[in-house]
C-alpha cells in the first residue's frame, strides 16, 4: 500500500532473493505480478503475461472470439506489440512466461476445443521462457459450471475443481 511505483515491494523481494540465492542457490522465484519488468527487477526469476492489464494474452485464449479459436475474428497484433515491448524491457533479466491458466481464470477448454487447444498449446510450449500448464489443462479439463462459490471463488470456482479423471487415463 502507498507504494505506487512498488519501490518498497521491489526492495523487499530483492532482499528475499538475496537470502534465497545464499541458502538455496538452485531455487527459482516465480512471480504472479503480471508485470515482468517490475517483478524481474524485484529479484524474481520469472513472471507471467497474465490475462489482465496490457498483455493482451486474453485475446489469444479467453475473449469472446479468441485468436486461437476457429471462429476468431480478432488479431494477434496487440499481443505481439505488448510481448515485444516486454521482451525489450526484460532482456537478460529473467524469463517472461506464458501460461495455460491458473486458479483465477476460466479453463482454456471453456473457450477452445479439439485442434484449437492443440494449436494453443503448441504456441504456449514454443514461446521463449518457461511454459506453465495449469493442472488438468493438459487433458482438456473443463470448467465446471454451477459450483457454489467458496472463500471468494466467485466465477473462478469452476476452474478450481479436483482433477477430472475418467477411464481413459
Regions found by a protein language model. Give the residues of each.
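Aromatic- and acidic-residue-enriched carbohydrate-binding clefts of CAZyme catalytic domains
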Residues: 1-7
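Conserved alpha/beta catalytic core and glycan-binding cleft of carbohydrate-active enzymes
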Residues: 13, 17-167
Amino acid at each position: 500500500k502507498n507504494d505506487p511505483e512498488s519501490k518498497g515491494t521491489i526492495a523487499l523481494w530483492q532482499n528475499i532473493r538475496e537470502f534465497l540465492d545464499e541458502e538455496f542457490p538452485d531455487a527459482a522465484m516465480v512471480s504472479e505480478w503480471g508485470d515482468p519488468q517490475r517483478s524481474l527487477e524485484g529479484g524474481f526469476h520469472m513472471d507471467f503475461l497474465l490475462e489482465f492489464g496490457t498483455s493482451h494474452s486474453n485475446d489469444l485464449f479467453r475473449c469472446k472470439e479468441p485468436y486461437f479459436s476457429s471462429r476468431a475474428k480478432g488479431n494477434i497484433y496487440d499481443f505481439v506489440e505488448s510481448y515485444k515491448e516486454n521482451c525489450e524491457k526484460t532482456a537478460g533479466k529473467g524469463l517472461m512466461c506464458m501460461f495455460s491458466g491458473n486458479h483465477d481464470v476460466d479453463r482454456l477448454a471453456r473457450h477452445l476445443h479439439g485442434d484449437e487447444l492443440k494449436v494453443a498449446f503448441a504456441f504456449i510450449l514454443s514461446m521463449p521462457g518457461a511454459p506453465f500448464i495449469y493442472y488438468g489443462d493438459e487433458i482438456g479439463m473443463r470448467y465446471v459450471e454451477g459450483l457454489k462459490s467458496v472463500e471468494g471463488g466467485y466465477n473462478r470456482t469452476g476452474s478450481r475443481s479436483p482433477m477430472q479423471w475418467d477411464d481413459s487415463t
